[in-house]
Structure formats: structure tokens, C-alpha cells
Regions:
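A conserved mid-protein helix/loop that constitutes part of the nucleotide-sugar donor-binding site
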Residues: 18-22, 197, 201-220
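Membrane-proximal helix-turn-helix segments that form the acceptor-binding/catalytic region
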Residues: 120-143, 149
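Aromatic "clamp/platform" in nucleotide-sugar-dependent glycosyltransferases that forms part
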Residues: 279
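Nucleotide-activated donor-binding/catalytic signature segment of Leloir-type glycosyltransferases, i.e.
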Residues: 242-260
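A short, well-ordered alpha-helix in the C-terminal region of glycosyltransferases
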Residues: 340-354
């Protein structure tokens, strides 16, 4: 079959983008042709992929999205496909991969009423309704149990159109047999002594991921503990505002900001704790990547995958609603207790052996390839 995938932006380090790539490659592995429509493509194009970057420009993102939809529709009219799979919400999809939460719910609960008069709101509300309305034919790949009831509440989407997928952690994130050697080499490279503690926070979109909360928690540590603790923040974002916050808090060389990179498994093995106090997070793939690497996790409860950390007993989950003081206390407790960290690491590795945390691409491909076009 000829399959078409559409997403607004591809870059190698985004969670949505990595999920797209693994699903598309799985469909290709099963013998199907892959075409991709996008506004921005950064990185290599896999052999056999046809990638089409829309030649459209607009002042506002929502207008650019609409132009992409129109340009794609015109191309599909000339060169039809058997399935159209979207990783952002838009009209005309056969299958939608629900990487993002419910826009309408956020608009009603987190925004004031004036927001709903803007063109931006109308665009995203209309595009979400095109996917989730009862009369829509789009099948929905869900990766978060938390969001499904919200879509049903706002749109009355029939239950049978939802397909809940298991997580899709890449096997290269699992701790290898030589994990101790990799950890030692990593810590030598970054000049980390045995008594120093390394926190990592990983993910693009520093504001949403709660980097400000992490910096406050680091600054609140007792002086002797703070002196031997470092934080590395890794992701595709402009760190300027957080660098200013870090300086204002007197953290100096204790904090490093690094761009998104392909050797994340080394950081998961070399660190002592993953901190992830996100404001909102549909899933949080990095939580499970840490779990399967044997890295203890400190996470906010709003993250869709936070329940895995609790089930595996591989770290601590903050209460909801979030309180900075609890984050400060939990961080201090986790850093001071070497025995507990070792136990959380063992628990994560044991959970990684028994739970299905890996088969999302295969399950997604099953749904995509099974759908008959309306």
C-alpha cells in the first residue's frame, strides 16, 4: 500500500517525531510505501521515504497549518494514497496518533473566555473537532489513558474509534551488560567524581517540562549537598531565560544546558537521577527510558506515564496539585539516600524485563494497515 504521513515538523529529538519515525519504518518494513508531508524536516531522510516539504509561508502558525492542509489535499487529489496518517490534528485523516492532549479542555480550563474569540483558537478547535467529532471516520491511536475521557467528554467520540497503544521504548535505551563501564567512561568525560551527583532533565520545551521548578529545587538543597550536585538540561529549546534564572539562584557551574543529541542512553547510565516536574505531559517517554536504564525518576503526577514509575517502584511521583516544597523535599531525600536509589534502579530493571514497554510501533502499524478507507 501507499501510505502518507503528515506532521508539522520533523526533527530527530522530539518525542512525537521519534514515534512517527518508528511507526513509519515499521510500516515500510512490512512492505508498504512511505510518503511524508511536512512544513519542516531536519535530519536525514530514511532510504525509500518520499519527503515533501510544503512551500508555504504565513505570519501565524495556524495559517501556515491551513496552507499545509490545502497544499497536501491538492497533491493527494493528483496522487492518491491508501491511508493518510496524521501526527497533528487536522481534517481528512484516516488515522490520528494522539501525541497531544485535548486542546478544547485546555482552552476551557486554562484560558480566559476572550481566548476563544481568537483565530488561533478557532483553527485548533476546528482541526481537533475534525478528528474527534462523532461523525468523523478517523481512527485514533491513544498513548495516554488520561486524555481519552477528556476527548469523549468534549466531543462524544465513539469508544470503538480509540486504540490504546502500549509504550514504545527503543530497545537501545535498556541498560546493556557493560552499563557500569559506560557509566564510568561518561563520568570521566564530564569530570564527575564518585561523590558528585548528576541530575538530568531531558526533553524539548523547557517551560512545559518544568525546568524552572528543577532549578528552584536544586537551589533549595542544603549547601553541602548542593555543592556536589550538578544538573544537565538536554533538549531543543532556547535556554536563555532559564540560564538567567540559574544565575539569579546562584547555581553557576552547577547547571549545564545542552542541545538535543543522539547519545541520550549514555546520560541515562551516567546520571544518578532523572528529574521531570512537568506542568503537563501527555505521556513522557523519557520516564520509561530512564526506568529501563535503571535510573531513578522524580516526576510530577500529571505525566501520562508517571503511573509506571509508581508501579515499578523506580522513583517518586509528586502529588497533584504540584507543590514546590514537596519537590524540594523529595529531591533532597532521593539524593541523600544512596541505598534507596540503588533499590529504585534494581526495581526499574526488573520491571523492564517483565512489562511490555516496547511494542507501540508494531501495534500502531497493525491498526494503520487494518483500516479500510471511508
Amino acid at each position: 500500500m501507499q501510505l502518507a504521513f503528515v506532521l508539522y515538523k520533523y526533527f530527530p529529538f522530539g518525542g512525537l517525531q521519534r514515534d512517527f519515525m518508528r511507526i513509519a519504518l515499521e510500516c515500510q518494513r512490512r512492505g508498504h510505501q512511505i510518503r511524508v508531508y511536512t512544513l519542516i524536516w531536519e535530519g536525514d531522510v530514511p532510504p525509500g521515504f518520499e519527503v515533501l516539504v510544503a512551500p508555504v509561508k504565513a505570519l501565524f502558525n495556524h495559517r501556515r497549518n491551513e496552507k499545509l492542509s490545502a497544499w497536501m489535499a491538492a497533491d493527494l487529489a493528483k496522487r492518491p494514497v491508501d491511508r493518510l496518517i496524521g501526527f497533528n490534528k487536522m481534517p481528512g485523516l484516516d488515522v490520528y496518533y494522539a501525541a497531544d492532549g485535548c486542546f478544547e479542555d485546555k482552552a476551557q480550563t486554562l484560558r480566559n473566555s476572550l481566548y476563544r474569540r481568537w483565530g488561533r483558537y478557532r483553527h485548533f478547535a476546528e482541526y481537533e473537532r475534525a478528528v474527534f467529532a462523532p461523525e468523523s471516520k478517523t481512527e485514533i491511536l491513544m498513548i495516554s489513558e488520561v486524555q481519552q475521557p477528556l476527548f469523549i467528554k468534549h466531543y462524544g467520540t465513539p469508544l470503538q474509534r480509540f486504540h490504546l497503544l502500549p509504550p514504545g521504548i527503543s530497545q537501545d535505551r535498556r541498560a546493556p551488560a557493560n552499563a557500569a563501564e559506560i557509566r564510568a567512561a561518561f563520568r570521566r568525560e564530564f569530570s564527575l567524581s564518585d561523590d558528585e551527583l548528576l541530575l538530568v532533565q531531558i526533553g524539548s520545551g523547557f517551560k512545559t517540562k518544568g525546568v524552572d521548578r528543577s532549578l528552584k529545587a536544586l537551589a533549595a538543597l542544603p549547601a553541602d549537598l548542593r555543592k556536589r550536585t550538578r544538573l544537565m538540561v538536554i533538549g531543543q529549546d532556547d535556554p536563555k531565560v532559564f540560564q538567567l534564572q540559574s544565575t539569579a539562584l546562584g547555581l553557576g557551574e552547577h547547571v549545564q544546558f545542552l542541545k538535543g543529541r543522539s547519545d541520550i542512553p549514555r546520560f541515562l547510565l551516567g546520571a544518578d537521577l532523572l528529574i521531570h516536574p512537568a506542568y503537563n505531559e501527555n505521556t513522557g517517554t523519557v520516564l520509561l527510558e530512564a526506568l529501563v536504564a535503571g535510573l531513578p525518576v522524580l516526576v510530577s503526577a500529571v505525566c501520562g506515564y508517571a503511573h509506571y514509575i509508581a508501579e515499578a517502584d523506580s522513583g517518586l511521583v509528586l502529588d497533584e496539585p504540584f507543590e514546590q516544597e514537596q519537590l524540594n523535599q523529595y529531591l533532597q531525600r532521593m539524593l541523600e539516600d544512596n541505598t534507596a536509589r540503588a533499590a529504585w534502579a534494581r526495581n526499574g530493571l526488573a520491571f523492564a524485563d517483565s512489562a511490555d514497554l516496547y511494542s507501540m510501533p508494531e501495534h500502531a502499524a497493525d491498526v494503520i494497515l487494518a483500516q479500510e478507507r471511508a
